Amino acid sequence: MRIQDFKVVYICPDHNEKYHARKVHMDTMLGELGFKDVVHFKSGSENYPRCLAKANIEILTKYMDVPILVLEDDVEFTGVDAFDYADGVDAIYFGLSRCASHPTNEINEGECVVSPFSDTQVRVYNMLGMHAILYVTPKFKRAVIAKFKTPIWHTDIAMSRIQPAFRIVANKIPSFFQSAKFNAPGHDDSCTLFTITTPKPPPSRVFKMPTNLRYV
C-alpha cells in the first residue's frame, strides 16, 4: 500500500509566524505527495504537552472507526511512500526514533527496543516519537485517549508505556523525520532519520515485557 491511501491529519497551532510557516510547509508537502484527504487540526495554545495531548484526543475520538495517519508539523518526507499493511496491527510508525522511554521516569533511556516482525517492519515496545503514526484499531485509539487524559509530561513517553500491550510496528525505513529546519538549534536529524537494520535490545539494560498491561 501507499501512505496516500489514508486520510492524514496534521497538528499545527498556526498561531504565529513560526507555526504559520510550518502550516504552509505541511500543506505544500502533502499536496505534492498526492494526498487527497488532508485535514489541518489547529491545536490550542496551552502549554506543552497539554496542547498536543488534547489535539490527539480530539483527532482519535473523531476518527475512531477509520485508520488515520497523524503527523506533527515539523516533519519532512524521506521519499518512501510504500509500505506493508499487515492484518492485526494496531498502529504503524511511519516515523522512527532512536530513543527509548524510561519505564517509570519522565526521561528517555538509551536506544529503543524492537523485535523482528517482517522483512520491512519491526515490532516496537518503548519507542519515543509521535511525529508520524498510522492509528488503525479502535481499541488502541481508546487506550491512547485514556492515557492522554491522565496527568502526563511528554506525550510520547505516555504512548510508549502502552506499546507492549498492543501490536505496534514500525517501518524499518521511515517515511517522515523531524527536520532541523523546524526545530531548535542543535537538533540532530539522525535521531529520527535512520534505517533499522538488525533489531537488538539496548546495551544499557535488558527489556522485560510488562505482564500487567491489558486493554480492550
Predicted regions and their residues:
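An acidic/histidine-cluster motif and surrounding catalytic segment
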Residues: 1-71, 75-216
